[in-house]
């Protein structure tokens, strides 16, 4: 099966090309912290020769608690993104939650993301498709990998074939997520070769069944990421924070920022190895 290439400016994303890092912070906590984190990612990825896209949310509209921090909002968030682009020359990915947000956000960033909980909302899909922007679709925790083909078809029917798919784990009973490594190949197949990436951070979430925030398994981020990269993926999606314990969202799953370089050294080594193997068809 021919693998589709999605171009983000000078960055090419495909399952058989060197992996792209979609990395940053969970939510924009402040302008200064966003600048600090983005600068660190840029420095490390340039040193290692890894194509890089900065990620952060301007609004976490799906927090468990009404009292949880959501972010600076659309207007202030777009200002921060514009400054990051001017300062560091980075491409940016962020999520949208309503049809009305799609075009204003696409006017600023390079990739707009369809959140997992909203992935079947047709009005939102149609609005995002109309922007012509590159789309990243998060696989819902409650949806099988094979069902992702229907979401891709919605975007293509809406005139947008610039679609990336992202796995972030699947429900395993109550309050737990697992990653089905066979699902990556299924998503490649049902999307006819669309780029597939792995959100290792959110796949590490686990919940207190009566709590107001997600827990996480940060200590296992490297082993889970290694497993995903061994499949042969278009990209890795990860969040890091200089002080995960005090992060405003999903700190228990975030990679400590100072561990980013040694972490990526390992991921690049696995990606280089796997993508230098000759094709091996075991179906026949």
Swiss-Prot record:
Oxidoreductase keyword on record:
no
GO terms for MF: 3-deoxy-8-phosphooctulonate synthase activity
The organism's place on the tree of life at top rank: Bacteria
Q: In which pathway does it act?
A: Carbohydrate biosynthesis; 3-deoxy-D-manno-octulosonate biosynthesis; 3-deoxy-D-manno-octulosonate from D-ribulose 5-phosphate: step 2/3; Bacterial outer membrane biogenesis; lipopolysaccharide biosynthesis
One GO BP annotation is:
keto-3-deoxy-D-manno-octulosonic acid biosynthetic process
Q: Where in the cell is it found?
A: Cytoplasm
User: What UniProt keywords are attached to this protein's entry?
Assistant: Cytoplasm, Lipopolysaccharide biosynthesis, Transferase
Which Enzyme Commission numbers does its entry carry?
Answer: 2.5.1.55
Listed under catalytic activity are: D-arabinose 5-phosphate + phosphoenolpyruvate + H2O = 3-deoxy-alpha-D-manno-2-octulosonate-8-phosphate + phosphate
Give any Gene Ontology cellular component.
cytoplasm
Question: Where mainly located?
Answer: cytoplasm
Please give the family membership noted in the entry. Answer: Belongs to the KdsA family.
Q: What is this protein called?
A: 2-dehydro-3-deoxyphosphooctonate aldolase
Question: What is the source species?
Answer: Edwardsiella ictaluri (strain 93-146)
């Amino acid at each position: 099966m021919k693998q589709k290439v999605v171009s983000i400016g000078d960055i090419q994303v495909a399952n058989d090309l060197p992996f792209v890092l979609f990395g940053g912070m969970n939510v924009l906590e402040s302008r200064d912290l966003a600048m600090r984190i983005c600068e660190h990612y840029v420095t490390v990825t340039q040193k290692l020769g890894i194509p890089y896209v900065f990620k952060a949310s301007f609004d976490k509209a799906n927090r468990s608690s009404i009292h949880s921090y959501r972010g600076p909002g659309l207007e202030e968030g777009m200002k921060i993104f514009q400054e990051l682009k001017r300062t560091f020359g980075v491409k940016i990915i962020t999520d949208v939650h309503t049809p009305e947000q799609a075009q204003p956000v696409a006017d600023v960033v390079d990739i707009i993301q369809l959140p997992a909980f909203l992935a079947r909302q047709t009005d939102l899909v149609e609005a995002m498709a109309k922007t012509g922007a590159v789309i990243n679709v998060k696989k819902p925790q409650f949806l099988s990998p094979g069902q992702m083909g229907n979401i891709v078809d919605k975007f293509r029917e809406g005139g947008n074939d610039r679609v990336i798919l992202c796995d972030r784990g699947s429900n395993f009973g109550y309050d737990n997520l697992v990653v089905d490594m066979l699902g990556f190949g299924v998503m490649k197949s049902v999307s006819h070769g669309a780029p597939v990436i792995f959100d290792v951070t959110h796949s590490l979430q686990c919940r207190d069944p009566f709590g107001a925030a997600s827990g996480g398994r940060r200590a296992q981020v490297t082993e889970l990421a290694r497993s995903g990269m061994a499949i042969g993926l278009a990209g890795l999606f990860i969040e890091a924070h200089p002080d995960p314990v005090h992060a405003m969202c999903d700190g228990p799953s975030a990679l400590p920022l100072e561990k980013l370089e040694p972490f990526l050294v390992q991921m690049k080594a696995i990606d280089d190895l796997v993508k230098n193997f000759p094709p091996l068809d075991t179906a026949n």
